[in-house]
Swiss-Prot record:
N-terminal signal peptide: none
PANTHER family (alphabetical): 6,7-DIMETHYL-8-RIBITYLLUMAZINE SYNTHASE, 6,7-DIMETHYL-8-RIBITYLLUMAZINE SYNTHASE DMRL SYNTHASE LUMAZINE SYNTHASE
HAMAP family hit by this protein: Lumazine_synth
Lineage: Bacteria, Pseudomonadati, Thermodesulfobacteriota, Desulfovibrionia, Desulfovibrionales
GO biological process entries: riboflavin biosynthetic process
A GO CC term assigned to this protein in UniProt: cytosol
Binding site for 5-amino-6-(D-ribitylamino)uracil: 25, 59-61, 83-85, 116
Protein name per Swiss-Prot or TrEMBL: 6,7-dimethyl-8-ribityllumazine synthase
Residues annotated as the enzyme's active site: 91 (proton donor)
Length: 156
């Protein structure tokens, strides 16, 4: 029986250049996502001098900014962090759907790993739980996914 070749990404951020796209809407949540993600990446060897922080108004602007950053060729990966909280109108559904699709499109179009840390929550309590409380920190999870994907892509 032959041996299966396995490709896996190591969680080593040394030498990488990363762009972080973070929304200003719901910044009391987003700042916790950013803090957790940057702490995680630094603990895994990322030099903070190699991080470019891009602050944008909200989730709807994320695809455009991620696409521009990916096309620049300056970064190994992008981290998209934000929080959209459901209100009383369908606006939530449109913003979440288009932001998600657009971020995925930028990732695929440019073969650029993008850590997807856009919270889409029904209420503030859910957002708080996902930004470092009961449900962990989704910014950390997005950073880990981005890092592992960068290292996998290097081997393909």
């Amino acid at each position: 029986m032959s041996t299966v070749k396995t490709i896996a990404g190591q969680l080593d951020a040394k030498g990488l250049k990363v762009a972080v796209v973070a929304t200003r809407f719901n910044d009391f949540i987003v700042d916790r996502l950013v803090g957790g993600a940057l702490d995680y990446l630094e603990r895994h060897g990322l030099d903070m001098e190699n991080v470019t922080m891009v602050r944008i108004p909200g989730a709807f602007e994320m695809p455009l900014v991620c696409q521009k950053l990916a096309a620049s060729g300056k970064y190994d990966g992008i981290l998209a962090l934000g929080a959209v909280i459901r209100g009383g109108t369908p606006h939530f559904d449109y913003v979440c759907a288009e932001a998600s699709k657009g971020i995925a499109q930028a990732m695929l179009q440019h073969s650029m790993p993008v850590g997807f840390g856009l919270l889409t929550c029904d209420n503030i309590e859910q957002a708080i739980e996902r930004a470092g409380s009961k449900a962990g920190n989704k910014g950390v999870e997005a950073a880990a996914a981005m890092l592992e994907t960068i290292r996998v892509m290097e081997q393909l």
